[in-house]
């Protein structure tokens, strides 16, 4: 994040919108996964979004305009489960961060939203090697990526701290 921000500043680029959407899956049990993999996971899902926000938020606040959309997950709102051990906790952290920042930034023109989708049709499950397991999920549990993106955009523009797309996930 530091090098990215330095490059943007060097080019005179002003950032008014940030979407933190990087991630990957660690589908094995915590005890069976090396610390290096777990550390990298936390770096991508927790540390990098926090650093990007920390570095960009002062400029957004000074300009009186900014939109920050943290792509979390409905998993961050549910109890923990075996495998993907850090995933729910990392996403819960993004949700709490978004809620806190949304509150802190009231009246500044900067909106912060946690987008919390459920299962969404993307290449994520192919890349993470979990596609076969996901095939067992009922089709009604799946969301289309464009609909999730639209709901997230609408939520951050309306300054909603949390957005849970899909009626099937709003009851969780």
Predicted segment positions?
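Conserved NAD(P)H cofactor-binding loop of Rossmann-fold oxidoreductase domains
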Residues: 21-26
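Substrate-binding pocket helix/loop in short-chain dehydrogenase/reductase
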Residues: 29-31, 37-42
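Active-site loop-to-helix junction immediately N-terminal to the catalytic Tyr of the SDR YXXXK motif
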Residues: 33, 80-86, 100
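A short, exposed helix-loop element centered on a Lys and neighboring polar residues
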Residues: 53-54, 99
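Residue(s) in the substrate-gating loop at a strand-loop-helix junction
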Residues: 73
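SDR active-site lid
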Residues: 102-168
């Amino acid at each position: 994040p530091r090098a990215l921000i330095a490059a943007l500043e060097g080019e005179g680029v002003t950032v008014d919108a940030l979407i933190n959407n990087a991630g990957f899956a660690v589908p094995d049990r915590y005890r069976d996964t090396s610390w290096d993999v777990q550390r990298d996971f936390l770096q991508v899902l927790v540390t990098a979004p926090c650093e990007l926000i920390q570095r960009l938020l002062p400029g957004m606040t000074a300009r009186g305009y900014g939109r920050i959309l943290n792509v979390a997950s409905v998993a961050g709102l549910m109890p923990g489960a075996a495998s993907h051990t850090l995933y729910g906790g990392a996403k819960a952290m993004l949700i709490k961060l978004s809620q806190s920042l949304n509150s802190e930034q009231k009246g500044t023109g900067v909106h912060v939203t946690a987008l919390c989708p459920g299962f969404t049709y993307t290449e994520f499950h192919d890349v993470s090697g979990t596609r076969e397991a996901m095939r067992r999920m009922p089709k009604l549990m799946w969301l289309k990526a464009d609909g999730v993106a639209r709901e997230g955009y609408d939520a951050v523009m309306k300054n909603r701290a949390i957005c849970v797309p899909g009626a099937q996930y709003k009851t969780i």
